[in-house]
Amino acid sequence: MNVLEQQLNHLVDECRPYTAQGKVADYIPELAHVKNDLLGVAICLPDGTYIHAGDVHHKFTIQSVSKALTLCYVLMEFGEDYVFSKVGMEPTGDAFNSIAKLEETVPSKPLNPMINAGALAVTSMILGETAELKIYQFRQFLATLLNRSVEEVTYDEKVARSEYETTDLNRALLYFMRHHGIVEGDVDEIIDVYTKQCAIEIDCFDLARIGRVFAGNGEDPDTGEELIPRRVVRIVKAIMTTCGMYDASGEFAVRVGLPGKSGVSGAILAVGNHELDLNNVGFGIFGPALDSKGNSIAGMKLLELLIERYTSR
């Protein structure tokens, strides 16, 4: 264990008590069973190797972190003009599942792709004759980012079913958007794809590698091959910076200052930048105890302290 990894272990120990101040996402029944005090962090370095601490081998579902990745996928498939004709790019102070801004905005398109309405609109763009084919296309894209076979990128069927059966508000968002011409197709099929997308299983190393791809402007850290076009990376990082942490995005930008995306499983993906001594790196964090805004309470603190101690200025 090197000095940096020792420091990372101390940081996890320092932040783990914060888990007692949060609670797991019990409104999704299958997520309610996760231990509250888990906390782990992996950092993918410029050469593709990792340092890590805590509960990094614990598997969890990607949840809303997938919103940044489906946005990448549809931008690569259809281009920004089409995608942003259906969804905006402005932050909102409302909760991630709010319908309020849809009713107030003309035309009635979601304000950004990181809230549920926007993410559902993005998922509805994925092509395929069936829901399984659509989720396969997304799994294939994710497999490319992770340097794995598509068969190794799986979703938790129990979590997907649990979310599918308790997602009336998302259905309402879709019906509203379909009425206004923002989305097309069968609502239940879109929900099926969306819940399976959110139920894909990953760990801290996977998140950190994806963050490293973003930090390297879309290049594979092992081969240098372009996995995501630089322009798409820039767009998605900008939207993660302004909208990625639900209605705590502004606070996260001030306290941490990195592009990031969280999920209600306790996942946080963050992208290193030039202000860090740890430049050109990706961060993957897992801490299922959430704060009132749906972000990992200990994970947010861990990132804040990590950045505070490793900034170059």
UniProtKB/Swiss-Prot annotation:
GO biological process: glutamate biosynthetic process; glutamine catabolic process
EC number per UniProt: 3.5.1.2
Catalytic function, reaction form: L-glutamine + H2O = L-glutamate + NH4(+)
SUPFAM superfamilies named among the record's database cross-references: beta-lactamase/transpeptidase-like
GO MF term set: glutaminase activity
Ranges in coiled-coil conformation: none
Source organism superkingdom: Bacteria
UniProt keywords, alphabetically: Hydrolase
InterPro entries reported for this sequence: Beta-lactam/transpept-like, Glutaminase
Binding-site list for substrate: S64, N116, E163, N170, Y194, Y246, V264
Subunit structure, interactors included: Homotetramer.
Membership in a protein family: Belongs to the glutaminase family.
Matching PANTHER family: GLUTAMINASE
HAMAP family cross-referenced by the UniProt entry: Glutaminase
Name of this protein: Glutaminase
Organism: Exiguobacterium sp. (strain ATCC BAA-1283 / AT1b)
Organismal lineage: Bacteria, Bacillati, Bacillota, Bacilli, Bacillales
Record gene name: glsA
